């Protein structure tokens, strides 16, 4: 006989896709008991007679999933680069665009000239698209300021945005995103600034949860990333890394060496990289939006990740240059159609494994007692439909921290 249990709200009348251990874990005709912001019981509604609820909601069918988690975005930036997209489709090369001082430097200029209020307002509009699809947790990176004052302003904008939206926002300092134009002849000096000036100030003001870098031949070398990681780890930051997107430099193994939460992109990760990630619990964050827009050919080694049991997350990588994507569900479909993931892996990739990539798997990402009450009610019969449909089928309800938003 179950012990009597009291809760604030009992949600029932739908199939619960728990995603415990990264599997669907479906409870048919299930129920979720919530007290305050937390789940205190999940199970079949037929077994809930012992629960005394102050409020009950019959969902009337459909499925319930954990709130979706977008674990890699660049939502805060100034300006717009749709003109470059059009130029490329009219035959203008990347090098020609760069010669016109376009590309990432165009975003850097626009971001540096934008006020904090302008950055927040623009990012909020982008973020609303993700939230409308059932996203309840979002990571947002800096990295378009590339000078101390502008990087701090970006992180302050992220913090301000977090206070204005019904979602959990995780901030990541990505000052090692590209070499600033002022340091193009001396990138080591910019690494000095990051390590000696910027990161200590970010830590002192509590502006970031993690530190990221871009390890690639057109950005920062493994040795330069190592310097950033040593400084960041000494200050208590969690670590993440853009690695193996365009070439194999051993960045994924470097991330694992430092016990980084994730290595992201990872198209060129080797078996030794994957083995290192498995040993250190580093999540592989796959970013099909950038792969698609750049028309890349090298797919991430999904079979190796499976074989070595490396958790695979999916994210939008929402950014103005290589992934202007504001739909996490589209990324789920791309993860399946472009990378060969299964629908179950894709859903795990935007719930439990995405939570792991943010160091939050003990609090969010699956529906079980003790976790935060973040969940989404969908007008669907099967979880695979979330991946199958391209657009449409918005949530019936989104519950964030126990409250319908």
Swiss-Prot record:
Reaction catalysis annotation: 4-imidazolone-5-propanoate + H2O = N-formimidoyl-L-glutamate
Pfam families linked to this entry: Amidohydro_1
Broad EC category: hydrolase
Entry keyword set: Cytoplasm, Histidine metabolism, Hydrolase, Iron, Metal-binding, Zinc
Residue stretches spanning the membrane: none
PANTHER family in UniProt: IMIDAZOLONEPROPIONASE (PTHR42752), IMIDAZOLONEPROPIONASE-RELATED (PTHR42752:SF1)
UniProt gene name: hutI
Name under which the protein is recorded: Imidazolonepropionase
Cellular compartments annotated: Cytoplasm
Family, per entry: Belongs to the metallo-dependent hydrolases superfamily. HutI family.
Residues engaged in binding Fe(3+): 72, 74, 242, 317
Signal sequence annotation: none
Gene Ontology CC annotation, any one: cytoplasm
Cofactor note: Binds 1 zinc or iron ion per subunit.
Binding residues annotated for N-formimidoyl-L-glutamate, in chain numbering: 144, 319, 321
Pathway the protein acts in: Amino-acid degradation; L-histidine degradation into L-glutamate; N-formimidoyl-L-glutamate from L-histidine: step 3/3
Annotated coiled-coil segments of the chain: none
Matches recorded under InterPro entries: Amidohydro-rel, HutI, Metal-dep_hydrolase_composite, Metal_Hydrolase
GO biological process: L-histidine catabolic process to glutamate and formamide; L-histidine catabolic process to glutamate and formate
GO function term, MF aspect, one: iron ion binding
Residues where 4-imidazolone-5-propanoate binds: 81, 144, 177, 245, 322
Cofactor(s) needed by this chain: Zn(2+); Fe(3+)
Protein purpose: Catalyzes the hydrolytic cleavage of the carbon-nitrogen bond in imidazolone-5-propanoate to yield N-formimidoyl-L-glutamate. It is the third step in the universal histidine degradation pathway.
């Amino acid at each position: 006989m179950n012990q009597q249990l009291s809760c604030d709200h009992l949600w029932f009348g739908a199939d619960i896709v728990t995603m415990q251990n990264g599997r669907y874990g479906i409870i048919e005709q299930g129920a979720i008991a919530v007290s305050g912001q937390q789940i205190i019981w999940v199970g079949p509604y037929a077994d809930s007679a012992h629960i005394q609820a102050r409020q009950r909601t019959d969902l009337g069918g459909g499925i319930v999933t954990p709130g979706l988690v977008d674990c890699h975005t660049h939502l805060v930036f100034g300006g717009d680069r749709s003109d470059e997209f059009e130029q490329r489709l009219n035959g203008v090369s990347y090098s020609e665009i760069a010669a016109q001082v376009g590309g990432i430097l165009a975003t850097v200029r626009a971001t540096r000239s934008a006020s904090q209020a302008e950055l927040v307002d623009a990012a909020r509009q982008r973020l609303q698209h993700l939230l409308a699809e059932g996203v309840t947790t979002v990571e947002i990176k800096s990295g378009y300021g590339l000078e101390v004052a502008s990087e701090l302003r970006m992180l302050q904008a992220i913090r301000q945005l977090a206070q204005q939206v019904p979602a959990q926002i995780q901030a990541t300092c990505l000052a090692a995103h590209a070499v600033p134009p002022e340091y193009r002849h001396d990138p080591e000096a910019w690494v000095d600034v990051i390590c000696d000036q910027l990161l200590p100030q970010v830590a002192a003001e509590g502006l970031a949860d993690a530190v990221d870098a871009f390890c690639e031949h057109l950005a920062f070398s493994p040795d330069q990333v190592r310097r950033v990681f040593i400084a960041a780890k000494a200050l208590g930051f969690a670590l993440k890394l853009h690695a193996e997107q365009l070439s194999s430099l051993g960045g994924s193994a470097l991330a694992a060496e430092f016990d980084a939460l994730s290595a992201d992109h990872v198209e060129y990760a080797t078996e030794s990289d994957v083995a290192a990630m498995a040993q250190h619990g580093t999540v592989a964050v796959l970013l099909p939006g950038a792969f698609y827009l750049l028309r890349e050919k090298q797919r991430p080694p999904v079979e190796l990740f499976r074989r070595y049991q490396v958790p695979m997350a999916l994210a939008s990588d929402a950014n103005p240059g290589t992934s202007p994507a504001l739909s996490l569900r589209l990324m789920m479909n791309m993860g399946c159609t472009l990378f060969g993931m299964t629908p179950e892996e894709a859903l795990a990739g935007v719930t439990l494994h995405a939570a792991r990539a943010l160091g939050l798997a003990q609090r969010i990402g699956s529906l079980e007692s003790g976790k935060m009450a973040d969940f989404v009610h969908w007008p669907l019969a099967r979880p695979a439909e979330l991946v199958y449909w391209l657009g449409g089928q918005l949530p019936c309800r989104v519950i964030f921290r126990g409250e319908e938003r």
